[in-house]
Amino acid sequence: MKKIFYITSIGIFSILSSCSSVVGVGESKIGKQQPSLSNTRWEVIGNLKTNARPYISFDPETGMNGNGGCNRIFSQNVIIKSQHGDFSIKNIGITRMACPSMDMNVETNFVKMLESANKYVVDKNTLELYKGNMLLIKLHKN
């Protein structure tokens, strides 16, 4: 059972982080001026093979809120500095509703990626979250 859960988690993580790559320094926008993320809803891009549709939005006064795929997620411990694209979300709170295991796996991996990200890049209507130069996840402006 643990083996199946582990394999499923890896598969879901792979789906969520599809197109993950290390960006070449010459073409990188990482560390450069970025637009504000405030008052915009950002939804995960990709075929999740589940009904889960994780999203986040940011408000200067209330922090981050959204949905991890099943449960509401939120944090007031948010640092977003558009000057260099610095990004940090810590202490994410999660409601605890009963959800299908596939949706819970998506949610767990989504929250882990949000808490791991330390840089962001906005390219047109796409928000890319990075840990260093490694792309973790892409979200679309909704």
Name each region found by the language model.
Residues 1-4:
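Positively charged n-region of N-terminal signal peptides that target proteins for export
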Residues 8-17:
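Bacterial N-terminal signal peptides
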Residues 6-7, 111:
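Short amphipathic alpha-helical "recognition" segments used for binding
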